[in-house]
Regions:
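Metallo-beta-lactamase
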Residues: 48-200
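Divalent metal-coordination and catalytic microenvironments
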Residues: 1, 16, 42, 87, ...
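Active-site neighborhood of phospho(di)ester-bond hydrolases with catalytic His/Asp-centered motifs
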Residues: 10-18, 43-45, 123-126, 163-168
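Active-site metal-binding motif and surrounding structural segment of the metallo-beta-lactamase
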Residues: 1-41
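Accessory terminal helices/loops
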Residues: 60, 158-160, 171-257
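Solvent-exposed loop/turn segments at secondary-structure junctions
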Residues: 17-21, 48-50, 109, 130, ...
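Short, solvent-exposed loop/turn and secondary-structure capping segments
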Residues: 24-25, 52-57, 135-136, 176-177
Length: 257
């Protein structure tokens, strides 16, 4: 930041409440110019505060599933820098003469938003786009967004961005590539969701729906849909989790009357 401006930090936006996106704020607040100017506004979706509270309440479980020592995680409310400005669906800000548009859609988390700077045609896509098949199906995590993830991708594809900054990975500065990347990811996720819905309506068991999942070459061979973190089948399981209960459809696993 200091390589481009000496001005104090005016506003900090949390794209979502994950550790790698919201836990480093303390370093920004220690900046001398910012300290002299006063506390910046901390802007986030309303559910970010709920996420922080959840991390405190279930600290041991979170540590286990993140493969982290418990003492590496926050132990009190004072360990977080909490939002001071919250929003629900969307929020427009005017910061230093720049229009900043925040738009919320549940996806990687239920508190995630993307950031659109229309005057610069610049998009911060947060974790909606990750450069590989995204984390919609991690079996160690809580429910991910499904249809809303697809909606967000298609919205972003239609913005006409000439620069896209993902939450992870390299920037893309080609408008046609941005549009293409967002659209094929949306199509891939929608393809999985639609198959799960069709299987449920055909009254198939959950394991049958996953086992029968079709993953065409258009997606399987695409370099930014690589199976790096989760598989298409994992994503199908997360979609099933959204619409069904804990029962796996095997009669002997149902509690006897």
């Amino acid at each position: 930041i200091r390589s481009v401006s000496d001005a104090p930090i005016h506003t900090i936006v949390y794209s979502h409440g994950h550790v790698d996106h919201a836990y480093g704020t303390w370093a920004l607040l220690k900046d001398e110019a910012t300290m002299a100017a006063g506390q910046p506004a901390i802007v986030a979706h309303r559910k970010v505060a709920e996420r922080f509270a959840y991390y405190l309440r279930l600290r041991g479980m979170v540590a286990r599933y993140m493969n982290q020592p418990p003492d590496h995680l926050p132990t009190s409310e004072e360990d977080f820098v909490w939002p001071t400005v919250e929003f629900d669906d969307e929020l427009r800000l005017d910061i230093g003469g720049e229009t900043v548009h925040l738009v919320h859609h549940p996806a990687e988390t239920d508190d995630q938003c993307y950031v659109w700077l229309p005057d610069r045609q610049a998009l911060y896509s947060a974790d909606y786009y990750q450069g590989f098949l995204p984390n919609m199906g991690n079996g160690k995590r809580v429910q991910r967004g499904t249809d809303q993830w697809v909606i967000a991708l298609r919205e972003m594809a239609d913005l006409g961005a000439t620069a896209m900054l993902p939450g992870h990975g390299e920037a893309i500065v080609n408008s046609e590539m941005i549009r293409s990347e967002l659209r094929i990811l949306a199509d891939a996720l929608a393809h999985i969701i639609d198959q799960v819905v069709d299987g449920l309506n055909a009254r198939l068991r959950k394991d049958q729906i996953v086992d029968c999942l079709n993953w065409p070459a258009r997606f399987a061979d695409h370099p930014t849909l690589a199976v790096t973190y989760v598989s298409p089948q994992d994503i199908a399981r997360m979609v099933l989790k959204r619409w069904t209960g804990w029962w796996d459809d095997i009669p002997s696993h149902w509690s006897p009357a």
